[in-house]
C-alpha cells in the first residue's frame, strides 16, 4: 500500500508576511509545496491530504488542488479552533490554532495507511522523501507503534539571515529517538554551529547533529493516541488559560516514546533544508531552487 503525504497548511507564517504557502518561488511560480509533492510522488507516495483553514478553501482549491487532481488522489481536511472533543469549549479570546498535532488529528477520517507529515513551507529536498518513503513502504501490513522522523543534519538547516530555533534530537544506539530539545538562537560562528544553552552560554554542536524539521512518519494508530492525549492537554488548566498554548507533534511523540508505547526511528538524510524564515531569505531560496532546476533535479516547467 502506498503511503500518504499529509501536508500541514493551516498555519499562517508569523515571521514572514503573507500566505507563504502560496508564494511562487520556482522559475514558473512553483511553491515550495509543489517541490515537496513532486519529490513525494517520485518517492512512492500515493495520496495527498492537506489540512487548511476552511475560509481558505476556495483559494486553495483553485491554486493548489487543481494542479494535482487527476494526477494523484487529493483530500482536503480543515482545522478550526472550535474542533474540540466533547465536553471542551474554546476559551474566549483564543484566536491561535491548537498546534501541529491538533492539525494532524484532522486527518483521522481520511488516512487509513502509513503516512508522512510535513510543513508546507519547508523545502525538505529529494533525499528526505526517499528515506521516509522507503521506511513507510517497508512497514508490514497492519504495523502499529513504529514511527519515524527525518533527522536533518543541523549544519544543513541554518538561515543566512539570522538565528533559527531547532529541535535537537537525542538518539540511542539503534537510531531511535530518545529526546527532542528545542534550542534557540542557532547559527554558524567561527566555523562552528552554536546555540545558546540553558545557562545562556554559546555551546558548539557537531554539524551532523540530527534536528527535527517536522517531517514525521506515522501509522494510523497515532490518531487514537492523539485524540486521547489531547483531552489530557485540554484538561490542564494552564493550557486553557494560556491563549497561545499549542499541542505540538513532539509533545505527543515524546509521551509515546517515554511511556514505551511506540518507537520513533531517526532517519538520516543528506538533504539540505531551506525555507523562508525571514523575508530576507526569499531571494536565497529562489536562487537555490533555480540551481536545483539547472542541475536537472527538478523539471524546468
Tell me the role of every PLM-derived stretch.
Residues 126-216, 220:
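Conserved core of the sugar-phosphate nucleotidyltransferase
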Residues 1-10, 27-117, 124-131, 137-138:
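Conserved N-terminal catalytic core of the sugar/cofactor nucleotidyltransferase
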Residues 59-60, 127, 225, 252, ...:
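Phosphate- and divalent-cation-binding pockets in alpha/beta enzyme and binding domains
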